[in-house]
From Swiss-Prot:
One of its GO terms (cellular component) is extracellular matrix. SUPFAM superfamilies: Metalloproteases ('zincins'), catalytic domain, TSP-1 type 1 repeat. Residues 1060-1098 form the PLAC domain. Its cofactor is Zn(2+). Residues 723-851 are annotated as: Spacer. This is A disintegrin and metalloproteinase with thrombospondin motifs 2. Binds 1 zinc ion per subunit. It comes from Mus musculus. It is an enzyme of class 3 (hydrolase). The precursor is cleaved by a furin endopeptidase. The lineage of its organism: Eukaryota, Metazoa, Chordata, Craniata, Vertebrata. Residues 29-260 form a propeptide.
């Protein structure tokens, strides 16, 4: 079926035919019938998360249940050894640094700050996503296959603290954090900025990208809904089952699973996930498995949404990653139906014959990045195909994590769900983000299953018996510690080289455990090896097994042993006596030590705490500066001693290594060592500290990992309400060539800015008032170059551009400074300054104190938001507005833009129960037309819910349970009054003798539409008389015909003659007007049929225009288009026979009434059409095109006339 034109050509979900061609001979599968139809595509759900979304960088940290920092390591792999660490992650309960053991239930906790919001994530393992015994299979180009256990131990679900019922989280921590965080009004994507950097997490944490998706745009309205979704009928399923034959019987019988059934409320979709090479190449072989697990974790979370109304788990039992060649053979570019057919057949061939096999799947999901359909097509699937051996499959275009909605949508089709708004009444839920919308508009913060999806699922779900078994209820055998215990050397040879290969036995001089040598029985002396030993545990001799390349007796002490942490040591001494230091404790992985390939301990081997946070007596001391000064006498650079000053490296990763700057040369030199533990990481952050070469985030509250910060004037967690802005301008005139004192800046000043008002040749100078040392431009040591430098424990930025100087620092100043000017000439000097300071530290003239917008205004409670529900228990939040402190007047919120907005307070509201909404209808509006065929009446139909305060409100129509009253109806559907319109008379039907003429007569309205005419209809046919025809002979091959009616009495009803009591209503047939038939008036049935012609009231020659009056009664234009003979009173039979001559050719008139005619008492008998030979000369007949109106209601007569006309040559009849 071609897609509809216009906007619908975007392929919302076109119904396309799946034409299953015969398979290749090796498949041994009969093709399903061509009538099987599949549901097609869905539009993309907005592209990858980054498109159209806000994004920030964030560094999540791992915490305990109370939100206290445990480690910067967030990846499960980081502390372990690859796959082995992942496999054992859930068993490890004491591997967390900081003494915070992992929750016994395997729960994890993370802190994350996104867009100004602090989130505390509480996660639990998603233990029901990957089935026990599940595998991942890599298929190579040469046909070789590598199978590995599928491990899902790094998949988690959970919620956000403080929003347990209004949030959901689905993350993986295989390699950083990746997945979704969904809250009431927002949703976030998170993924590592760069993959494969888990080894760097322990140093300074792992940088992640967090996307915030904007609201999904409202779709354009569709003028007419189109039912584009058509599923497979039951007949098609039956025919497909018959086509599968014996194979089908075997599969159907095998559905009686013997595993323990799940509870009646639980359904498990065991999934085979097929992935083609385009997906593998895009994500990379080393990352694709983690990505697939994260994607399916999100799909599983979508099916856990309570709006679905059912408990459905999506369980992975097998992943197959296809080779490039196989991927190209399955997907046909631009042909979605053939591509889906190929995928479904491929999935069928992957099915395990034993239903008890742990890889037996109920449903196949295939992911590709190839364009299998038109642009924009994202998915393709059958409807109601679940549990079917061939049709339980979907084809999906993979395009990032948002493809989870495409997978959920297409699997919904297989479960029996239709598109919302197409064939159901849920089109109004499309814009709300319903999963089954024709264009997928669901977003991670606003998705739901519509009420129609819930109803359609409940209609079919109980019939899907394959979803009843529980894959987690097996008593699965424990995996052997040594894999070779289950595979002999012969089996390993077959794996390596193919069927028939066995261990080489031609030579017995080598140790079989050194290298695996294989040969084929056809050539036993030709041995091959892949230069690798057999698997550990492979039997090599009676009672002996291969281990580490040796054939030995296996004893418990040589088997693999995993390591475990020992006890913590006591905390050591503090690294500093004041100014906040750190102290450590350690532990060893010796309880027991890992051995024989066992996994090492996960987590950090040390833990630390802050100590001695009190300020040092010397407030001007700079711990980093002291460390540089210690090397003045010991560290020579360029064979010269230097005075070393502190330097902050531009690279954040190097800031916990000691770099110093030469006071003499300005060179920056690495001291080849780390700074002491407890040194501030940066002069821009007064609290974060270096610990063993790593910068550890510390909040202003002294808590490790805390995000709490100071406001602009140093109040921890403050809102700038106690900040004052001080500014001023000082102007001096040089009177001598000596320092000119301008002003002083007090200790505690922050965000200091000093600059020249005009361009001058003077030099700015700054001196520490307490020590008397210059920190910028001494008189005998001027440096006019722009630069950054560290002095008095803070970083300064000095700029000299076009002889206009500027000096600024974030601060805070630990002591008072004096600002001076070194004059050059006698030009007046003007300096301006501006800084912020806490109001309690203010000791300046009030004239210099200013209050900016951030100080003069504050956020204030404005009102409570409307309750989210009018009944049944809703919630409302505080709404804040910007208020001016001076007069408490509410102003525009822009004045408070620099202030942190308080968090909204939530409270419950409207707890009373809701009443059932009912349908309320309005009055019918006047009809749109007074007559015709388009008249309509409309009225309003609303779903109204009575409220507790004797008011009502309009609610969504889905809340009203009863049948919705009609809102439109037809009215005044009758023909409009018209007038008869007659056309011109046609040419006489003969050239001599008596013939007929016709003309069209139509009843039309003023606007030329069909109408109803109440006046008598003008005649449409009349007799024309021309000169008598000559009686000479004619061509015997030419024949004319006359119709002869033969009737016999009806034995059940006596013949009734026409009497005066039976008033003649006019002729009932067009043949009555032909004079040659007048001889049949003696027959009662014919006399009654042609009562007017057989009993003329006056001479026809005296009739006006020589015509015959039409029968009385009203005739409308509908008669013209539906001409017919009177009722079925005559049967016909063609039989040529001689008869009386015809004076006019047989012609069907168009004046046929539509009124019902009373039946006669005559029983139909065949009548005959007799040939009239050599009586009418051929030039007498005028050939003409049969009228469009030549029809009869008597089907037998019409068929007879048509048959005669076909037999004769054109122009003869």
């Amino acid at each position: 079926m071609d897609p509809p034109a216009g906007a619908a050509r975007r392929l919302l979900c076109p119904a396309l035919l799946l034409l299953l061609l015969p398979p290749p001979p090796l498949l041994l599968l009969p093709p399903p019938p061509a009538s099987v139809r599949l549901v097609a595509a869905t539009e993309p759900p907005g592209g990858p998360p980054g498109q159209g979304a806000e994004r920030i960088l964030a560094v999540p940290v791992r915490t305990d249940a109370q939100g206290r920092l445990v480690s910067h390591v967030v990846s499960l792999e980081t502390a372990g050894a690859g796959v082995r660490a992942r496999r054992a992650a859930l068993d490890q309960t004491s591997g967390l640094p900081g003494g915070a053991a992992q929750d016994p239930g395997g729960r994890l906790f993370y802190n994350l700050t996104v867009f100004g919001r602090d989130l505390h994530l509480r996660l639990r393992p998603n233990a029901r996503l990957v089935a026990p015994g599940a595998t991942v299979e890599w298929q190579g180009e040469t046909g070789d296959t590598r199978v590995e256990p599928l491990l899902g131990s790094c998949l988690y679900v959970g919620d956000v603290a403080d929003l347990p019922k209004a949030s959901s989280v689905a993350l993986s921590n295989c390699d950083g954090l990746a997945g979704l965080i969904r809250m009431e009004e927002e949703e976030f994507f998170i993924e590592p900025l760069e993959k494969g950097q888990t080894d760097q997490e322990a140093e300074q944490g792992r940088v992640h990208v967090v996307y915030r998706r904007p609201p999904t745009p409202k779709p354009p309205p569709v003028s007419e809904p189109q039912a584009l979704d058509t599923g497979v009928s039951q007949g098609n399923l039956d025919s497909l089952s018959r086509a599968l034959g014996v194979l089908e019987e075997r599969i159907n019988s095998s559905r009686r699973r013997v595993r323990r059934h799940a509870t009646d409320d639980d359904y498990n979709i065991e999934v085979l996930l097929g992935v083609d090479d385009s997906v593998v190449q895009f994500h990379g072989k080393e990352h694709v498995q983690k990505y697939l697990l994260t994607l399916m974790n999100i799909v599983n979370e979508i099916y856990h949404d309570e709006s679905l109304g059912a408990h459905i788990n999506v369980v992975l039992v097998r992943i197959i990653l296809l080779s490039h060649a196989k991927s190209m053979s399955l997907i046909e570019i631009g042909n979605p139906s053939q591509s889906l057919e190929n995928v479904c057949r491929w999935a069928y061939l992957q099915q395990k014959p034993d239903t008890d096999h742990d890889e037996y799947h109920d449903h196949a999901i295939f992911l590709t990045r190839q364009d299998f359909g038109p642009s924009g097509m994202q998915g393709y699937a059958p409807v109601t195909g679940m549990c079917h051996p061939v049709r339980s499959c979907t084809l999906n275009h993979e395009d990032g994590f948002s493809s989870a909605f495409v997978v959920a949508h297409e699997t919904g089709h297989v479960l029996g769900m239709e598109h919302d708004g197409q064939g159901n009444r849920c089109g109004d839920e499309v814009r709300l983000g319903s999963i089954m919308a024709p264009l997928v508009q669901a977003a991670f913060h606003r998705f739901h299953w519509s009420r129609c999806s819930q109803q359609e699922l409940s209609r079919y779900l109980h019939s899907y018996d394959c979803l009843r078994d529980d894959p987690f209820a097996h008593d699965w055998p424990a995996l052997p510690q040594l894999p070779g215990l289950h595979y002999s050397m012969n089996e390993q040879c077959r794996f390596d080289f193919g069927l028939g290969y066995m261990m080489c036995t031609a030579f017995r001089t080598f140790d079989p455990c050194k290298q695996l040598w294989c040969s084929h029985p056809d050539n036993p002396y030709f041995c091959k090896t892949k230069k690798g030993p057999p698997l550990d545990g492979t039997m090599c001799a009676p009672g002996k097994h291969c281990f580490k390349g040796h054939c030995i007796w296996l004893t418990p002490d040589i088997l693999k042993r995993d390591g475990n942490w020992g006890a913590w040591t006591p905390f050591g001494s503090c690294s500093r006596t004041c100014g906040t230091g750190v102290k450590f404790r350690t532990r060893q992985c010796d309880n027991p030590h890992p051995a024989n390939g066992g996994r090492t301990c996960s987590g950090l081997a040390y833990d630390f705490q802050l100590c001695n946070p009190q300020d040092c007596p010397n407030s001007l001391a700079d711990f980093r500066e002291e460390q540089c000064q210690q090397w003045d006498l010991y560290f020579e650079h360029g064979d010269v001693q230097h005075h070393w000053l502190p330097h902050e490296h531009r690279d954040a990763k190097e800031r916990c290594h000691l770099y110093c700057e030469s006071k003499e040369t300005g060179e920056v030199v690495s001291m080849k060592r780390m700074v002491h533990d407890g040194t501030r990481c940066s002069y821009k952050d007064a609290f974060s500290l270096c610990v063993r070469g790593d910068c550890r985030k510390v909040g202003c509250d002294g808590v490790i990992g805390s995000r709490k910060q100071e406001d602009k004037c140093g109040v921890c967690g403050g809102d700038n309400t106690h900040c004052k802005v001080v500014k001023g301008t000082f102007t001096r005139s040089p009177r001598k060539q000596d320092y000119i004192k301008m002003f002083e800046i007090p200790a505690g000043a922050r965000h200091l800015l000093i600059q020249e008002a005009d361009t001058t040749s003077h030099h700015l100078s700054v001196k520490n008032l307490e020590t008397g040392k210059f920190i910028l431009n001494e008189e005998n040591h001027l440096d006019p170059n722009s630069r950054s430098f560290i002095a008095m424990g803070v970083e300064w930025e000095y700029r000299n551009e076009d002889e206009r100087e500027t000096l600024q620092t974030i601060g805070p100043l630990h002591g008072t400074i004096t600002v001076l000017v070194i004059p050059e000439g006698d030009t007046r000097i003007s300096l301006t300054y501006k800084y912020m300071i806490h109001e309690d530290s203010l000791n300046v003239d009030d004239n210099n104190v200013l209050e900016d917008d951030a100080v003069r205004h504050e956020w204030a409670l404005k009102k409570w938001s409307p309750c989210s529900k009018p009944c049944g228990g809703g919630s409302q939040f505080t709404k804040y507005g910007c208020r001016r402190r001076l007069d408490s007047k509410m102003v525009h919120r822009a004045f408070c833009s620099a202030l942190a907005k308080p968090k909204a307070i939530r409270r419950a509201c409207n707890p009373q129960e809701c009443s059932q909404p009912v349908w309320v209808t309005g009055e019918w509006e006047p009809c749109t037309q007074s007559c015709g065929r388009t008249g309509m009446q409309v009225r309003s139909v609303r779903c109204i819910q009575p409220l507790h305060n004797n008011t009502t409100r309009s609610v969504h129509t889905k809340h009203c349970n009863d049948h919705r009253p009609e809102s439109r109806r037809a009215c005044n559907r009758e023909l409009c009054p018209g007038r008869w319109r007659a056309g011109s008379w046609s040419q006489c039907s003969v050239t001599c003798g008596n013939g007929t003429q016709e003309r069209p007569v139509l009843c039309r309205t003023a606007d030329d539409n069909f109408g109803v005419c109440r006046e008598e209809r003008p005649e449409t046919a009349r007799i024309c008389r021309l000169a008598p025809c000559p009686r000479n002979g004619s061509d015997p091959s030419k024949k004319s015909y006359v119709v002869q009616w033969l009737s016999r009495p009806d034995p059940d009803s006596p013949i009734q003659k026409i009497s005066s009591k039976d008033q003649c209503q006019g002729d009932k047939s067009m043949f009555c007007r032909m004079e040659v038939l007048s001889r049949y008036c003696s027959i009662p049935s014919y006399n009654k049929l042609c009562c007017k012609s057989c009993n003329p009231p006056r001479n026809l020659s005296n009739t006006e225009d020589g015509g015959v009056e039409p029968p009385p009664g009203k005739h409308n234009d509908i008669d013209v288009f539906m001409p017919t003979l009177p009722g079925p009173t005559v049967a016909t039979q063609v039989q040529p026979s001689p008869g009386p001559p015809l004076e006019a050719p047989l012609n069907v008139s168009s004046t046929n009434a539509t009124e019902d005619h009373p039946e006669t008492n005559a029983v139909d008998v065949p009548y005959k059409i007799h040939g009239v030979d050599e009586e009418v000369p051929s030039p007498n007949l005028i050939p003409r095109r049969p009228s469009l109106y030549v029809k009869t209601r008597n089907q037998r007569i019409q068929e007879l006339i048509n048959a005669v006309q076909r037999k004769e040559k054109p122009g003869k009849f």
